[in-house]
Amino acid sequence: MTDMNGETEVSNLNSSTTKKVFIRGRFYGDKTLPSLNDAISEYARHPKAGGKMKNDCKWICIAAIRKYLKGWKVTNPPIILHYKFYEPIKGQKRDYGNIFDWCDKCFQDALQDCKVIDNDNPDWVTNFTHEFFYTDGEPYIEIEIEEKGR
């Protein structure tokens, strides 16, 4: 079932629930978020610069979580996070692993800060998947939170 905001909740017989979060926009040049290589460069330049980059990315994730989840909390952990990255078709192509790693770190921290999950340890987040696509429109990241339960 999809509501007017594009938020999707699916329930099935094994009581799995799925929610989606979208991070849309160009927050880092022509990309949605920086990659791990960009973060390492910032930390090498100055630790506070790297910390600021991480904090900025986390706040972008927090804004998206608040917009799409509207106070929803995981009640039946663990969860699996499914990421779909829509990168700009023009410009520099980036290493998929580095894009995913940094986004995953910032997003899981944001989930904790928003109290969607209590922790990002394996009791709460057991797995993740990631796919990459190219778009000639605005870049974005789609994150599906699948509540698996024990």
State what each model feature region is.
Residues 1-150:
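Catalytic phosphate/metal-binding cores of nucleic-acid and nucleotide-processing enzymes, i.e., regions
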